[in-house]
Amino acid sequence: MSQTPQQFHIQAKVALKDPQLRANFRGAMDYLRDKRKTAFSDAKEEKAIRDLAESIRQRCLSKLPTLLEQLEQKCSQNGIYVHWAENPEQANGIIAEIAQRHQARMIIKGKSMVSEEIEMNHEMAKLGIECLESDMGEYIVQLDGDKPSHIIMPAIHKNKQEVSDTFEKNLDGFTPTLDVDELIQTGRTRLRQKFHDADIGLSGVNFAVAETGTLCLVENEGNGRMSTTIPKVHIAITGIEKVVEYLADVPPLYSALTRSATGQAITTYFNMITSPRKKGEKDGPREVHLVLLDNGRSQAYQDEEMRKTLQCIRCGACMNHCPVYTKIGGHAYGTVYPGPIGKIISPHLLGLEATKDLVTASSLCGACGEVCPVRIPIPELLQRLRREAKHDAKSGNTVMEGQKAAHSNLESMAMTSFAFAATHPTFYHSATGLTTKMQALIPNKLGAWTQCRTAPKPASKTLHQLLKEKQTMADDHSGNKSSKDKS
């Protein structure tokens, strides 16, 4: 059964009952958090990096329409074909047209979350075009008929034994092993010839530079470089928000990205593509296409508050520090982008009605906002989306026209009742006092919260009563002391 955001609560329960999954994530999350902590060991340096990254992203977003036009102009001058796609259907149509024009039977893919967003593999398969993942994590989950569970490390939910089992099941002649180097070498060996066999190479884009028309790709495995240089045709696909103004904007963002994602000062490979192969050059594609996808991004851009979601540089740090994601993993969310960032991006892509359960799946602890390298105020945006999801248009906080979710009358009544009690002290004190006297009648199971916890027993005395008694004792003590002094 495929996961969907509408089934989040069911999927989360299934994940929580899987001890192996939780163990896999516990080890992986601890590792990634430690790596980031080491990379940002100097608090002043961390602040400086994040300050600069935030200011660059905000500046670039403030000029987004102009920068996109400039990017198109520069790319066209460089010989890169630029295509605009309003939605996944248009994006897949563009890619399909290019593939069919070149009579392509295989597309070799570098890392691309946007290709997951548009379900490109599935759509190309309908046309008889094979899409083969070359990122090792993506390759593993593709072999298993699975989906990525993390935007940086797609197979993070699998341990060595599970990877070995996947290879044994899908690769002829594979000898089971738990040696990580051997597992990686097996994947590389099977993929190497595929780069030469592929008719088209496809990649994502980390930064698209408007000043020069340059496409920047960040990676550690070398598959991105091979998939963009060996095939005769290269297609790069990215969201419209990835544009930056100047080439000088890239190094600060690159530093913030790598440190936050994997704890590295720099990645093993950093690719810059400015044109197809020129006369006299020995490698590189003969044709380069850039597909710029909207898919709800321009709608978010029009909202001054929700525009901040477009600052994201896809590092995954918020996921690694989220107490919800680290317990249930990415599949439970049922969306391409899981975790905290997914909760505020997915409503633009799928609508708030479909994703309303995700925005409440948060403790609002603020850890995601504290580690975000571009300082997206994720907790505040989640609260904004919660208001919209629960109160519909009645709250006066319309997030995105046409994407409002239904509100719960029962929950609204409960919140209204609490607000009344909290603003009327006499009523509040009477109600809490009555609760302590009737605690024997309160059931042990109080909804979903107590399905995995023991409901706490109300104290025999309320805080107000304890404070009153303490004040009385203090007054008595003060009075006794005063009497002794007089005598």
Task: Describe these PLM feature segments.
Residues 1-305:
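The feature marks the mature, well-folded catalytic cores of soluble enzymes
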Residues 4-25, 29-33, 384, 410-487:
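Intrinsic disorder at enzyme termini
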Residues 70, 74, 78, 94-98, ...:
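Generic, well-ordered alpha-helical scaffold segments in large soluble proteins
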Residues 137, 265-269, 398-400, 409, ...:
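Short coil/turn segments at secondary-structure boundaries
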Residues 245-247, 261-266, 320, 379-382, ...:
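Acidic/polar loop patches that form or flank catalytic/metal-binding clefts of enzymes
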Residues 280-309, 324-444:
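Ferredoxin-type iron-sulfur electron-transfer modules in oxidoreductases and energy-metabolism complexes
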Residues 310-317:
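Conserved, hydrophobic alpha-helical core segments of structured domains
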